[in-house]
Amino acid sequence: ARGNATLPGPSEVDLRRLPAPKGTPASLADAGTPGSNNFAVSGALTADGRAIVADDMHLGLRAPNVWLRARLRWPDPDAPAGQADVSGFTLPGLPAVIVGSNGHVAWGFTNSYGDYMDWRLETPCPVDGADDGCAPAVRHMEQIEVAGGAPVAFEVLETAWGPVMDTLDDGRALSLRWVAHLPGAINLGLADLALAADLDQALAATDRTAIPTQNLVIGDRNGRIAWRLLGPIPVRDAGCPQRLPLPG
């Protein structure tokens, strides 16, 4: 029948027939490798014709927790039947549900593990002037508030390529360019997914969305599913090395 997958029986899959792994239980313990997974099932394979979306971002538990479950409801002429109603997980202060469903579409993210960063070896100019061949740099002094203690000053050195992440013994610095740091790479277009009535509207909303690049799956109540990378992708010159830092 539609949506009823045939599961293998014990005559086909019996884990007791497999050889026992060698070693002690302690040596065989899971190392806890980080990861995440998601999938979408077309309505052609489900019992009622609606798509199924599953998403496990493998995020750790904290106290206080960073991710919160939430349901948002408000009247909106752009929402189905004029009423937005979305449930899922979000971050405090963000006016959008990051992953969830509005009853018409459901969506989920995992890390895309793409190559979105480029490093550059540079020699930042000294504070008291500019040397030949050095990279002009700006120093930002950030103040980090500490609960129950005095604030901590944190200096960030930034060149035209990006923030300096490390300094080598010879004085050269590794600066980072990440597509998510570029102008226009981040916006709140994700909030429009709450108003989508079907897959086409959801994909149109993602066309207007800019976040650090994620692996996105979507499904709708009509049984349609989609996958795409959501977020900016770097456009590199042909001679740009991808395995080593760019020379300064």
Residue ranges of predicted features:
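Mature extracytoplasmic enzyme cores
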Residues: 1-248
